[in-house]
């Protein structure tokens, strides 16, 4: 059977490119997953592939190849994918769609330094090109520790899989953390780019795949309502919070030595800051979006002195959800003298005309009060209030809160008169909820991002410069913490250490209670 070659810019010839009503469907292609035995592949990647197929967004001849150090047959691999899909898929299970997807499954056993295994992988993909018409177009998903990226990329290069000929394409997908600091990030980027050109590298930040994060662009640039007040004249400060209520039991191998700042602030929260603070791009072309994010990150720096504008903590024993939980140092796998922070908060300044003088407060942590991610623009108080103090006792500051998860949506908080004969003003909320406004469920972030990889659409993926600028911003705080003692303890189920509360109180502000 003659291979079916498809151009990198494959388009459905029956569809008008201006028609936005129909979803984009990937052309002939396949995907190889390295690290198929890990949690990421099992809980996120495999279910997302099935959900895309179930929604009709993958080509009928799509192939999925697993690579791991296991003595498995293709049938064994298929069972692993089946179990993952049954447990974690978002859409209903349909046997017919599953059977069609499973026809494209293959498995290659081997280690990352095994030349023969990669030769077998190349042979397997060549057969799939001939038998299923994948067209020589393959995405390589590295669901593996970053230390293994260079050796896998080199093996893909040696086996001829990294640089396809003609109109075929090869793309590599890598997961955070993108390095440990600026120096290691540059080293990692250099190793990956030695094999794959930058336009073929897709760095997954799953927060950018969330509908509410993408809605920041619509909220800001499709509505005249918000732009006039989206600046230092009206905004007092911005709070970006990612809180989790879970602990780290069983994750010591990954988390110990990394900590909350490297795990979340360097990537997720810096990207949320960039989307919140960037200027309007000339278009939604990937290069235009990336240019604006790079500009705002270039203008961002840590506020000083760092002992007053940053905070780090480590959760101690406490109560969470009605249960008594242990502290980090009593979790399995953590040394009793571990200095890994489970809470981090920093103050950033964005030195642009729009944001000069507006502090951006970023915080993240484990074992906090509840699971929530939000961006809150807190506005300045009205310059003159013709009310006496008793009328406004319960009045706070106006705020716009973008809820990323859970209960995705937007809340506007403002003052309103309480019904009655007296002039009493109290805060009220105006709510927009995705779940109420739209009948269709939001797709899982990995669905959108994997589809974008297969389509060659890089808008939602950070480039080298963004990654390195984020490290450049964060590194001074990491170095300061390393040189100054241990993290402050905070009780599980609370909202972080006292030092984080004091960080805002020094300036007359308070953290929002999500």
Swiss-Prot record:
Transmembrane segments: none annotated. InterPro entries: G6P_DH, G6P_DH_AS, G6P_DH_C, G6P_DH_NAD-bd, NAD(P)-bd_dom_sf. It catalyses: D-glucose 6-phosphate + NADP(+) = 6-phospho-D-glucono-1,5-lactone + NADPH + H(+). GO terms for cellular component: cytosol; plasma membrane. Its EC number is 1.1.1.49. The active site is at residue 268. NADP(+) binds at residues 69, 176. GO terms for biological process: glucose metabolic process; pentose-phosphate shunt, oxidative branch. It holds the Pfam family G6PD_N. GO terms for molecular function: glucose-6-phosphate dehydrogenase activity; NADP binding. Keywords: Carbohydrate metabolism, Glucose metabolism, NADP, Oxidoreductase. SUPFAM superfamilies: Glyceraldehyde-3-phosphate dehydrogenase-like, C-terminal domain, NAD(P)-binding Rossmann-fold domains. Substrate binds at residues 206, 210, 244, 263, 366. Disulfide bonds: none annotated. Pathway: Carbohydrate degradation; pentose phosphate pathway; D-ribulose 5-phosphate from D-glucose 6-phosphate (oxidative stage): step 1/3. Belongs to the glucose-6-phosphate dehydrogenase family. Catalyzes the oxidation of glucose 6-phosphate to 6-phosphogluconolactone. NCBIfam families: zwf. This is Glucose-6-phosphate 1-dehydrogenase 2. It comes from Mycobacterium tuberculosis (strain ATCC 25618 / H37Rv).
């Amino acid at each position: 059977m003659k291979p079916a070659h498809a151009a990198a810019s494959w388009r459905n010839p029956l569809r008008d490119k201006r028609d936005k009503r129909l979803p984009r469907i990937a052309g002939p292609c396949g995907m190889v997953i390295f690290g198929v035995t890990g949690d990421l592949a099992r809980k996120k990647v495999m279910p997302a592939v099935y959900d895309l197929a179930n929604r009709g967004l993958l080509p009928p001849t799509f192939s999925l190849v697993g690579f791991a150090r296991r003595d498995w047959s293709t049938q064994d691999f298929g069972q692993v994918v089946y179990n993952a899909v049954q447990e974690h898929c978002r859409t209903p299970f349909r046997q017919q769609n599953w059977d069609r997807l499973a026809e494209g499954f293959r498995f290659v056993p081997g280690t990352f330094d095994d030349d023969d295994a990669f030769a077998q992988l190349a042979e397997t993909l060549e057969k799939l090109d001939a038998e299923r018409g994948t067209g020589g177009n393959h995405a390589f998903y590295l669901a593996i520790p970053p230390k293994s990226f260079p050796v896998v990329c080199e093996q893909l290069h040696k086996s001829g899989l990294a640089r396809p000929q003609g109109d075929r394409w090869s793309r590599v997908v890598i997961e955070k953390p993108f390095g440990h600091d600026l120096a290691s990030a540059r080293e990692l980027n250099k190793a990956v780019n030695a094999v794959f050109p930058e336009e073929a590298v897709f760095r997954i930040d799953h927060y950018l795949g969330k509908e509410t994060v993408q809605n920041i662009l619509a909220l800001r640039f499709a509505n005249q309502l918000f732009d006039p007040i989206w600046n230092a004249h009206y905004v007092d400060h911005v709070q970006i919070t990612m809180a989790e209520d879970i602990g780290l039991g069983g994750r010591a191998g990954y988390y110990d030595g990394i900590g909350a700042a490297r795990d979340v602030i360097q990537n997720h929260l810096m990207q949320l800051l960039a989307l919140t603070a960037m200027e309007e791009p000339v278009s939604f072309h990937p290069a235009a979006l990336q240019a604006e994010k790079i500009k705002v990150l270039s203008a961002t720096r840590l506020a000083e002195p760092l002992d007053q504008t940053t905070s780090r903590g480590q959760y101690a024993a406490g109560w969470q959800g009605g249960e008594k939980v242990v502290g980090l140092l009593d979790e399995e796998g953590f040394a009793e003298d571990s200095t890994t922070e489970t809470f981090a908060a920093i103050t950033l300044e964005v030195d642009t005309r729009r944001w000069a003088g507006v502090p951006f407060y970023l915080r993240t942590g484990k074992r906090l009060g509840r699971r929530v991610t939000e961006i809150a623009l807190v506005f300045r108080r009205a310059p003159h209030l013709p009310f006496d103090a008793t009328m406004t006792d319960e009045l706070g500051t106006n705020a716009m809160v973008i809820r990323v998860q859970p209960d995705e949506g937007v809340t506007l908080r403002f003052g309103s008169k309480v019904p009655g004969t007296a002039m009493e003003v109290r805060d009220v909320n105006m709510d927009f909820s995705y779940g109420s406004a739209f009948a269709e469920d939001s797709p899982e972030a990995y669905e959108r991002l994997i589809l974008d990889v297969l389509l060659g659409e890089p808008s939602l993926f950070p480039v080298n410069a963004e990654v390195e600028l984020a490290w450049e911003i964060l590194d001074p705080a990491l170095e300061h913490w390393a040189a100054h003692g241990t993290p402050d303890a905070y009780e599980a189920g609370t909202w972080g250490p006292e030092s984080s509360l004091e960080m805002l109180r020094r300036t007359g502000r308070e953290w929002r209670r999500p």
